[in-house]
């Protein structure tokens, strides 16, 4: 800094004769108090003059002494008082909307992410319908023949002739019902039941507490598929004019866009005089995003500006919806067929009747009880599925708050 405009401290020059007092100058600015000077030598007492008023002396001529050495630099002055804010200037006419920049290059496809952890076992599927009735078992073995009856004693022959042959006797009373037979063999395993309906998607879970440490930024995933075009929204109201942004990076030349429709010519505004600089206002609220306009013609390549500040990382997203239940496991193999039951106990022999005609085949017996369920399948669980496509990019973040104004600089000389 150049402090030559500040008053310099007195230097130790040669003491010349005292000159006449000069004319009073204009009052200068109040300077800082300089260092105390060295005490001068005491003067010698001159001879006493004659009493009485003497003639007025002539004005002496001052002799210019040699220039003293350069003094030490003084301390910097205090900063001046801040002036009152000026009146706000009139808003200028809005400038024309610049041409839309060319799209950037497509990002590289990121490396596939690491294999996910093994998922939890799926829930047990619904019980399938009952299988068809098994086929009839083999016919039973014929019972053992009963013991031969004892012969009665021969009666005495009567004196008369032999009578006619008697009529056939009534059939004997049926014997008591025998004990129930042994249970039949286990039936065959029923057919595989149809797959159950997919479960209803659960409601999205509440976001968990953000207590964990911020995770590392993962590698970029593959580009997501293009979403469906949304309907044209209503035009939003014009937001307040924001501060001018930094110059964007130089884009690459793309294909010529469709010419935009010419808007109505507005009335020319009056040119206002330059107003004094006012205080920075508070940040305005972001306006509603209007519909995307038609792509205008490509403008000339602009000068590449400095890179903007890096934005803050986004907040973690909400937890996704719960996935659908997994498919039921494969049906296990059929269980082993049980051993054949023991033959029943022979019934008590009844009275021997006459041999009747051969009867018709009997009805098929009732099906045996259902066999126990087979062992669950022992197949290995399938591998985890591939990672899904990358989601659509989120909306652009809002501009950050404007920083506080800097300190006022020291006024130069």
UniProtKB/Swiss-Prot annotation:
Posttranslational modification? Prolines at the third position of the tripeptide repeating unit (G-X-Y) are hydroxylated in some or all of the chains.
Gene Ontology process terms (BP) = extracellular matrix organization
Instruction: Kindly report the protein's main subcellular placement as a broad class.
Output: secreted
- Give this protein's Gene Ontology molecular function annotations: extracellular matrix structural constituent conferring tensile strength
For the keyword Secreted, the answer is: yes
Q: Where is the composition biased (Low complexity)?
A: 21-48, 117-138, 183-204, 237-247, 291-307, 342-361, 401-413
Answer yes or no on keyword Glycoprotein: yes
Q: Which GO terms describe its cellular component?
A: extracellular matrix; extracellular space
Q: Which PANTHER family match?
A: COL_CUTICLE_N DOMAIN-CONTAINING PROTEIN-RELATED (PTHR24023:SF1112), COLLAGEN ALPHA (PTHR24023)
Additional free-text comment from the UniProt record? These protein fragments were extracted from an ancient phalanx bone collected at Arroyo Del Moro in Argentina.
Q: What is its biological role?
A: Type I collagen is a member of group I collagen (fibrillar forming collagen).
- Can you name this protein? Collagen alpha-2(I) chain
Which organism does this sequence originate in?
Scelidotherium sp. (strain SLP-2019) (South American ground sloth)
Taxonomy, top ranks, is: Eukaryota, Metazoa, Chordata, Craniata, Vertebrata
